[in-house]
Amino acid sequence: MEKNFNIKQIKLKSEELRKKFIKLLINGFKYHIGGTLSCLDLLVVLFYSNFFKIASKNRDFFLLSKGHALAIFNIILIDKKLLSYAKLEKGYKKKNFGGQLDIFNSKFVDWNTGSLGHSLGVGIGLSIRNPKKKIWILVGDAEFEEGSVWEALFYISQNKIKNIIIIIDRNKMSASSSIQKKDIFDKKILHQLNLNILKINGHNHSDIFKCYKKCKKQIFSSIIIADTIKGKGYKILENNPKYSHQTPSIAVLKSLVK
């Protein structure tokens, strides 16, 4: 797997997809900007470093629990020629705000999204039914305010579920408030679950790669706490709660992709 990792190419791919996301906004699509950009690097390493072969018939499972970040997932599908821009545009012909993933719209979507906090439970079901496959789940840190997340974690721990990899996009902000001081992400607390706990810089491609590689080899489930920045890549967007629901002017957006 390591021979497939080219740090320079991965960094360039992140930059490329980040610009493609901004261009979608310029074209009239409206998405949750901050939370999409915070997890972009995590997904680029996952899908472009041979960890997750999304086009494979016998692939693992991926659940984007924070479904409001679906834009980057769709951009990856388009980039891999698994989704056409025309189909994306048709699906969003009214170009309403946001959107969610739907298993009936794509064979590459493994679970519907919408209400937060439920994908871990779904992941448990998939893991039990598919014990030889890895279940990758990307969750937002704000989802840990949902009791269903903790119930799922306790179940994974108590029943020694072995094949789930949970990636926490720890951007320290929900849609409306800061969750920077929450102590639930302290490794000491999570270690009580007796799972493999790792903490990384969620924008350092090399660190992400090494972490994923380690988790792939583990014989028990893992939790990755990825410290990220909401709106990563553009200073005007970074850690700005306004852009959880608002979109900058076209002039500002165009200035970002010059």
What are these model-derived regions, one by one?
Residues 60-62, 133-137, 164, 218-228:
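Generic beta-sheet signal
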Residues 108-216:
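Thiamine diphosphate
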Residues 1-10:
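Non-catalytic, mobile gating and regulatory segments of ester bond hydrolases
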Residues 13-30, 169-170:
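N-terminal capping segment at the start of a domain
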Residues 41, 68-69, 171-172, 204, ...:
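Glycine-rich beta-alpha junction loops
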Residues 21, 31, 36-159:
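Cofactor-binding active-site loop characterized by glycine-rich and histidine/acidic residues
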Residues 74-76, 148-150, 176-180, 233-239:
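Short acidic, glycine/serine/threonine-rich loops at helix termini
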Residues 205-258:
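Glycine/aspartate-rich loop-and-adjacent alpha/beta segment that forms the canonical ThDP
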